[in-house]
Amino acid sequence: MPLEPGAYRLGDGRERVAALRRVLIGRWPVATAHVRTFTDATGRSVSAHLGRRLEAEQRADHPVTEVSFADAIDFCAWAAEELGRPVRLARGDEWEAAARGAEGRVWPWGDTFDPERCNCVESGWGWTVPVGAHPEGAASGGAEQMAGNVWEWVGDPADQDGWRTVRGGSYLDTAWGVRCARALPADPQRPTATTGFRIVIEYEDTG
């Protein structure tokens, strides 16, 4: 889905305005089936937890989890070769702008929480759901599941401790935790059952 160029209101608490360039951001988080295609094509070794996830056919259309930051980066590199275009993780500002839209919404669909539009604690699912399960929870630009279901790695630089950042909250987070502005530090080498990722495809004139 296109993230249009412009100035976006961002931030949790103290808001700021960021000017962003145009990119294509994934409509959904990357599904398990896509990562299985990647590992089958490349022969890349994976952790035991991720291996079990990839073998679970009933979750092929769920967002992949149990992926480290390096797993996500390697998938992007493979996808770039397959597509012949630059592919990477969304930067934090891009991710938040795609979720909040030009309106600067609290949740992707608006400023009033609705557990029927996402997968979080209040929704009652207790596990991941298919990536296309909540079209009614889409952001104004069309990206879906940017609130809940799984946290998503973003491509911001590591902090002083080497930790990376995840965005969006998961099925284990409450309404407050799945706000568009929500971000958490995460150990890049520790995959979890609540973390996946989403890709960005750059236009030819983006850096």
Segments (PLM) and residue ranges:
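A short glycine-rich, aromatic-capped structural motif
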Residues: 1-49, 67-70, 148, 203
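Functional-site microenvironments in short loops/helix caps that host divalent-cation chemistry
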Residues: 3, 52-193
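Short, acidic Gly/Pro/Ser/Thr-rich loop/turn segments
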Residues: 10, 173, 206
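Residues within well-ordered beta-strands of beta-sheet-rich folds
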Residues: 24-26, 78, 154, 200
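Surface-exposed helix-capping loop/turn segments at secondary-structure junctions
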Residues: 41-45, 78-88, 205-207
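Short, structured beta-strand segments at or near domain termini in extracellular proteins/domains
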Residues: 194-206
